[in-house]
Amino acid sequence: RDRYEGCPQTPGRWLVIAEYAAPKTIDPALAQARMLDILAIAPRILDVPAEHVHAKARMRSRGGSQYGKQGAGKSGSGERANIARRRLPLIEEGGLTFAVNFDDYLDVGIFLDHRVTRNLVREHAKQARRFLNLFAYTGTATCYAADGGVEETVTVDLSNTYLDWAERNMRQNGFVGPQHHFVRDDVLVWIRDQRQTRNRWDLIFVDPPTFSNSSKMGRRTWDVQRDHVELLAGVSRLLAQGGHCLLYTSDA
């Protein structure tokens, strides 16, 4: 149970209520009634205005990309431009601000349950010079690393939409300049390429999806149970001497 707290530019408080679609063994009317009860009670208990409550339904599926869309359709340059033009709400966390999108995606741009992990990134960043964020999503960990004092960041994700979002988050917090790099690539392919260079990082944060079969990966799929050994072996070769890697996974 947690809430999204606004910042002075967009004050307020938001609540997202998400549940998996009920199995066929459950009466749809009972499932709907339960959800309506939650929508009626939760905002009162958590002191969130009704217009700031967002309900989302998830499907138990292993397909698709890392972060699903709320509606149908594919992400493209037109959608990226549309999102960039919109005035998304800004929330505050740990002295930083982040843009959130409650309407277009199942995940809104920041995972509240990662808050402790982001603080760990900032603490480790105080002793690091170069930071690498793999499977970066909207770059919130990069913002924390920059706030911790690293001199250079590299943010890698397969999605142009999320890289744009990450750059926007960095800019919102005053972290701009040629020392901050945003790379659109398949992470495993990118790691293999970097092993041929002298690029090494003092702190690497890795937050892989459980599963992905994004069309951007070609014929290859990603499964964290199958591929984590290759991933960690590759990451270990990109660490500077005395460097640290922080791995986050929600896969049981």
Task: Give residue spans per PLM region.
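Non-catalytic accessory regions of SAM-dependent methyltransferases
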Residues: 1-22
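Non-catalytic substrate-recognition/targeting regions of SAM-dependent transferases
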Residues: 34-111, 119
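Conserved class I S-adenosyl-L-methionine
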Residues: 129-134
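Conserved SAM-binding loop of SAM-dependent methyltransferases across substrates and taxa
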Residues: 140-149
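Conserved SAM-binding motif I beta-strand of class I
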Residues: 152-157
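Mobile active-site "lid"/loop adjacent to the S-adenosyl-L-methionine
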Residues: 162, 201-234
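S-adenosyl-L-methionine
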Residues: 164-199
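Conserved small/polar residues in nucleotide/adenosyl-binding loops
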Residues: 248-252
